[in-house]
A protein has these predicted regions:
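Solenoidal tandem-repeat scaffolds enriched in leucines and small polar residues
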Residues: 136-211, 231, 238
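A generic tandem-repeat structural signature
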Residues: 75-154, 168-172
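Core register positions within helices of long alpha-helical scaffolds
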Residues: 53, 84-87, 115, 146, ...
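Short inter-helical turns and helix N-cap capping residues of alpha-solenoid HEAT/ARM repeat scaffolds
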Residues: 42-43, 73-74, 104-105, 135-136, ...
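N-terminal leader/linker segments that initiate helical-solenoid repeat arrays
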Residues: 13-56, 76
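Amphipathic alpha-helical scaffolding segments comprising HEAT/armadillo-like alpha-solenoid repeats
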Residues: 27-38, 59-71, 90-102, 121-133, ...
Length: 367
């Protein structure tokens, strides 16, 4: 696939006199060097980006970098590295996960238990069950969730119990695990939370059912898109994305006063195959809030519209690093011949994080 891509774009990239196989080799070597250099950066967020980009490459040659990053002093870098190994090598991910169940950071520890359950076969059940005795609620939830996925449904109650935990983060994490379990048995518990008094609980429950909503949920979703709370409105709009009958409800939200609600409505419509509201993506790339612009850039990676390449190039010219970072990852997600020359050009970008993500995605395209 990578060789075919180069054949298509070599003339455009200024390599007309070069053999395609040599071009592939040069781009790959340059990309690997960029990732290695980025991981040496003193700034933690750059190292974290390098680890995430290495995972996105899905390339075996970057396993040593990812293993090294699992021992980084920055928890986010360790987490991204572990998640990256999951994309590259099941055996390496399991080895790292077993070690990282003792990590100093609770979020990394619980992610390690979750990955142990997700990537392991029946042989990990005994290991995962041991974490049911952990003093950390997130560890116990990760273990219980993993066991439910392995068919031990009696542990579902251990994931449901934290929904009433006094610490909000524990409640939200429980909702997240229920969403990942995602079975028909779990959905009614999540739908029940649509009536919760706390907007945050409603928001997270809506996020958890995204892609799994049923027609029975539609009446309540129609109520929620009219709430004053913008976060609830935008999560409810996204939750409608797999219900084609919700199209008439979503179209008016494309004119909502909140940028994220508009974006969610346009994205939900796109996911259901509707061509309505496509102009919203370009509008929001000009929004005064960089958070909205970065979100708009990010979803273009999955949004198949005719003008996508032009819009991504627009986002890559943004003056905020978050927007440009989201845009380069979206270009990689888009993939194909159109992405290739854009990513090659970004190997010389002024921002190291942009160069790192371009490198990771190019390595993936060249596989």
């Amino acid at each position: 696939m990578g060789f075919l891509l180069v054949l298509l774009v070599v003339p455009e990239m200024g390599f007309a006199d070069s053999r395609p196989d040599m071009v592939v080799k040069k781009i790959r070597e340059t990309s690997l060097a960029i990732l290695q250099k980025a991981y040496q950066n003193e700034r933690a967020f750059v190292r974290a980006a390098a680890a995430r980009a290495a995972g996105e490459s899905q390339d075996l040659e970057l396993i040593p970098l990812l293993n090294k990053a699992t021992e980084d002093v920055y928890p986010t870098a360790r987490l991204f590295a572990l998640q990256g190994l999951q994309k590259v090598s099941r055996s390496d991910a399991l080895t790292a996960a077993r070690r990282m169940t003792d990590d100093t950071d609770i979020w990394v520890r619980s992610a390690a238990v979750e990955i142990l359950g997700d990537e392991g076969g029946p042989e990990v059940v005994v290991e995962v069950r041991a974490f049911l005795k952990s003093y950390d609620v997130p560890m116990r939830m990760a273990a219980s969730s993993g066991l439910v996925k392995h068919g031990e449904e009696k542990y579902l109650e251990d994931v449901l119990d934290p929904l009433t935990h006094p610490i909000p983060d524990r409640r939200y994490q429980a909702i997240g695990y229920l969403g990942k379990i995602g079975t028909q048995e779990v959905l009614p518990h999540l739908a029940k939370l649509f009536d919760h008094a706390e907007p945050e609980m409603v928001f997270y429950s809506l996020k958890a059912v995204e892609g799994k909503t049923t027609a029975e949920m539609l009446p309540k979703l129609r109520e929620l898109i009219k709430r004053d709370n913008a976060s609830v409105r935008y999560a409810a709009a996204l939750a409608m994305g797999n219900l084609r009958e919700a199209e008439p409800d979503l179209i008016p939200l494309c004119a909502d006063k909140d940028g994220m609600v508009k974006l969610s409505a346009a994205l939900a419509l796109n996911r259901m195959g509707s061509s309505s509201c496509q102009i919203v993506f370009e509008e929001l790339l000009k929004h005064p809030d960089f958070g909205v612009r970065s979100a708009a850039a990010r979803v273009l990676g999955e949004t198949k519209i005719d003008d996508r390449v032009r819009l991504l190039k627009m986002a890559l010219e943004d003056n905020h690093s978050r927007v440009r970072t989201a845009a380069v990852r979206a270009v990689g997600m888009m993939g194909g011949p159109e992405a290739f020359p854009i990513l090659v050009k970004l190997l010389e970008d002024s921002l190291e994080v942009v160069r790192a993500y371009a490198a990771g995605n190019l390595i993936h395209l060249l596989r």
